[in-house]
């Protein structure tokens, strides 16, 4: 059962940081957690509507949230921020104003920082979006996984494992298919990983995509 654990949660406190950093009183903790979820889902929908990449990949790597008493700072890591930044500052201002109204920030300021991911296809979330787009276009599962691994290898990753589960290619019985390239030491605690679990809705039902990318080992 050890191989089914979330590799990011396993390494928290050693070589993995939290994506949300804030402090809250016990009574207000659930409210702050719901606020985080609202922020993430709002930004994802906003980026989907912007159509960041012409290839259909949104390019959203991750969202980091830092909260203080009078400030909420959001760092959005994008693989393809070109269209969003071309409209700057209008694009960012619109996002900031709309999100402030949605959250009802009150006296807290909202600060949004866009950071470009230098090698987009070395990020598992962006690769998972790419595979999801291929599967929606009825490309075979194995072909989509191989293409994703080729893109990851071009981005100089040390190792990658891609797994897709569900009714693959419309088969009646659900199964799991995976491909691994390079070194993927999932049981080594000092090994640093990027990981994502991504559901995709197809005409055959929901498929689950999991991607592990080996970054390196902490010394």
UniProtKB/Swiss-Prot annotation:
A GO molecular-function annotation: rRNA binding
Domain KH type-2: residue ranges: 39-118
Protein's cellular compartments: Plastid
GO biological process terms held by the UniProt record: translation
GO CC annotation terms, alphabetical: cytosolic small ribosomal subunit; plastid
Disulfide bridges in this chain: none
Summary of subunit composition and partner proteins: Part of the 30S ribosomal subunit.
Protein name, as recorded: Small ribosomal subunit protein uS3c
Species of origin: Cuscuta obtusiflora (Peruvian dodder)
């Amino acid at each position: 059962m050890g191989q089914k654990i979330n590799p990011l949660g396993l390494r928290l406190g050693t070589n993995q940081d939290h994506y949300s950093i804030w402090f809250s009183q016990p009574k207000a903790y659930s409210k702050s957690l719901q606020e985080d979820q609202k922020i993430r889902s709002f930004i994802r929908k906003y980026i989907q509507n912007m159509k960041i990449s012409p290839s259909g990949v949104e390019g959203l790597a991750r969202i980091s949230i830092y909260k203080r008493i009078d400030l909420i700072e959001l760092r959005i890591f994008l693989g393809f921020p070109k269209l969003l930044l071309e409209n700057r500052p209008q694009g960012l201002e619109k996002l900031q104003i709309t999100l402030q109204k949605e959250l009802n920030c009150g006296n807290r300021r909202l600060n949004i920082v866009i950071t470009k991911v230098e090698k987009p296809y070395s990020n598992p979330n962006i690769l998972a979006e790419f595979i999801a787009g291929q599967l929606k276009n009825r490309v075979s599962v194995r072909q989509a996984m191989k293409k994703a691994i080729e893109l990851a290898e071009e981005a100089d990753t040390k190792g990658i494992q891609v797994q897709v589960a569900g009714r693959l290619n419309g088969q009646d019985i659900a199964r799991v298919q995976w491909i691994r390239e390079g070194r993927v030491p999932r049981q080594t605690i000092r090994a640093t990983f990027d990981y994502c679990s991504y559901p995709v809705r197809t005409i055959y039902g929901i498929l689950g995509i999991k991607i592990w990318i080996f970054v390196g080992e902490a010394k």
